[in-house]
Amino acid sequence: IYIGSNEVSLKIFEISAKRGIRTIDYVRTRIELARDTYSIGSIGYELVETLCDTLAEFHKIMDGYRVDDYEAYAAAAIRDAENELFVLDQIRIRTGISVTVLSNSEHRFISYKSVAMRENFEKMIEQGAAVVDVGGSSMQITIFSEGKVVTTQHLGIGAIKLQEQLVRKSSNLAQYELQIEELVEKQLAVFHAMYMEQQKVKYLIVIGDYITEIAGKVKKNLDETVESSKFNEVLEKLSQKNVEEISEILGLS
């Protein structure tokens, strides 16, 4: 179970000596916990109710599959909330699920472990790669060259955090895209000047919500890489749509 900034998800795995690790179910529910955390500082009672109800349903699903064991993790949205302990206590009392809150370094480590399992990962980092982990509260960039880590930098430009900053600054929705672009480019320009002048990146490995859905519109087999030009074409088409249309196209509605 993963409690993220924008959604809560449950994956059921079957583990056997013959088949290895196989995903047999994947359930996702959109709950924007980070919206409360980064606007009012804590998670509101209504969202706590919704979260507990969702996790109770997850528990029923686990019972249906007769799971032998589980792990439940939460990241920044709960970690940064002033009422973190209250939320965790409510979850435990009302659902019986014990949640482990990951530190930033623990969260990134687990994410990078999953990326490193790819068969061609070693080849990518040998030729030059950037692993970009985009979360709700922050973004972390790790640059690899000749198979070694060159630098890892933490930037405070997560998706939800950016959104909340813009809501406070302006009510003009038409300007959001331009303002987001300016904020991100400003931080990336500093990063590029400090760490990228002498580096060549051939592969961009992105970790984050919905990146799989977007990449899936370019190529069905996501075990392979996606050409950046084709990926940008999909992004350009999506930028012409409204939120409802994008949700429908990506199968998120």
Question: Predicted regions span which residues?
Answer:
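Helical "lid/coupling" subdomains associated with nucleotide-phosphate turnover
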Residues: I12, D36-Y65, A77-V87, R92-E126, ...
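A generic structural motif
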Residues: R19-I24, R66-D68
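Gly/Thr-rich phosphate-binding beta-strand-loop-beta motif of the actin/hexokinase/Hsp70
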Residues: I1-I21, K123-T152, D209
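Hydrophobic residues in beta-strands and at strand termini
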Residues: I31-L33, V134
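Short acidic/polar active-site loop segments enriched in Thr and Asp
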Residues: N6, D68, K202
